[in-house]
């Protein structure tokens, strides 16, 4: 069950990891790497394709009161996003490391969508009653995925490369 269908969680933001499909990791390797990243992570609902490559998974981080749905995407949607990112980022001032990542984006034809959720542990509170969500687990997960697939993390809200 997707976290979107779970009343215990509220979606907050979506980040991406773009990569070349040839570097798509095995589902078992992703689950193991995430568990090594933090022993408190609960990795469930791991789905693989026929070749054993990751399709999707759910990760819960009870210590951060957060969770993530991670899904694999490829095709025209990724190509369009890649072109938009290339056009936008090419006009901005980038450091040397970001320039290398930008050049690599041109080779990317796949991505992982990381949907970040916050535990809805408040009763009757509105969005403004919440404390700001700590993105620590999200950033660690994004970094782990980027290393596994030799990809580039993207924060679409700020347009920055991670």
Regions found by a protein language model. Give the residues of each.
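Short, intrinsically disordered low-complexity segments
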Residues: 35-104
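Short, extreme N-terminal segment that most often corresponds to the first beta-strand
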Residues: 1-45
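Hydrophobic, Leu/Ile/Phe/Ala-enriched alpha-helical segments that form helix-helix packing faces
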Residues: 29-41, 93, 141-149
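Well-ordered, non-membrane alpha-helical segments in soluble/globular domains
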Residues: 26-27, 88-95, 132-139
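Short glycine/proline-enriched loop/turn "hinge" motifs that connect secondary-structure elements
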Residues: 6-7, 101-109
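Short, surface-exposed beta-edge/turn micro-motifs
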Residues: 11-15, 54, 109
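Residues in well-ordered beta-strands of folded domains
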Residues: 17, 60, 113-115
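Glycine-rich, aromatic-bearing surface loops/beta-hairpins
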Residues: 108-162
């Amino acid at each position: 069950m997707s976290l979107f269908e779970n009343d215990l969680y509220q979606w907050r933001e979506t980040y991406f990891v773009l990569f070349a499909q040839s570097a798509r990791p095995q589902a078992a390797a992703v689950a193991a790497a995430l568990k090594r990243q933090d022993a408190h992570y609960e990795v469930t609902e791991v789905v693989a394709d026929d070749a054993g490559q990751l399709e999707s998974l759910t990760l819960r981080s009870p210590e951060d009161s957060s969770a993530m749905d991670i899904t694999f995407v490829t095709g025209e949607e990724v190509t369009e996003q890649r072109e938009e990112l290339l056009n936008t980022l090419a006009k901005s001032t980038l450091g040397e490391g970001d320039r290398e990542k930008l050049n690599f984006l041109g080779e990317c034809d796949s991505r992982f969508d990381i949907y970040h959720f916050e535990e809805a542990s408040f009763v009757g509170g509105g969005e403004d009653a919440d404390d700001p969500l700590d993105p620590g687990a999200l950033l660690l997960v994004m970094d782990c995925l980027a290393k596994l697939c030799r990809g580039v993390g993207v924060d679409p809200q700020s347009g920055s490369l991670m």
